[in-house]
Amino acid sequence: MKDLRLLLFLAILFLVNPSSLFAQEIMKTGPTFHGIRDFREVMPGALYRGGANNGHAPLNHGELSALCEDDIGTAIYLYTTGFSGPSITHCSKGDLHYIDKSWEGSGRATVHKQVYDSIKSKGKPVFIHCWYGIHATGAVAATALMQFCNVSPKQAVDYWKVGVPAKLQYPKVIQSIMSFKPNPALQLTPEERDRYCPRFNAN
């Protein structure tokens, strides 16, 4: 009887405030995925993130193949170190395009446009990464949430801090997020936000 009451309470809690449960998921670190560290869903079906886990280097062939088999359409390396140029990985799910773009300025804007185009065309998701999957990757993911999901600067910074040790929470990166201004030309419809945006607690 006690177990039944507990289940009933949990069911009511979920029905009354499901967004709070979804909000907990976005604020967690991710697992290792075929060698890719801290693999996380940012915007379901549209944007994913992680770290290369290869030192100061881009993704290796095995990691690219795993992303391709997971039906990711584009992988973006947010640095230039060790990058030998754009490539295409073929797999049973199709093709994965691998490119590099900066995590700041026009590079970040290009990443946001790539995500926007993928959503509008109902294409495959985008995966972004840096070396460890926290600083640059987190900043681009945080500003994407501001761009597409109406997330506040404070919420975005709180999201970026997940998995980042306090001593490595660099003011430069935080300021980059706080000062970001969404591009009005890349706005999603309310229906698209409902489909692709995670839930955050009010903040």
Where would I find each of the regions flagged by the language model?
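Cys-dependent protein tyrosine phosphatase-like superfamily
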Residues: 21-127, 139-203
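Bacterial N-terminal signal peptides
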Residues: 8-18
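Substrate/cofactor-recognition hotspot
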Residues: 133
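Bacterial N-terminal signal peptides that target proteins for export
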Residues: 1-8
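Active-site environment of divalent metal-dependent phosphoester hydrolases
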Residues: 136
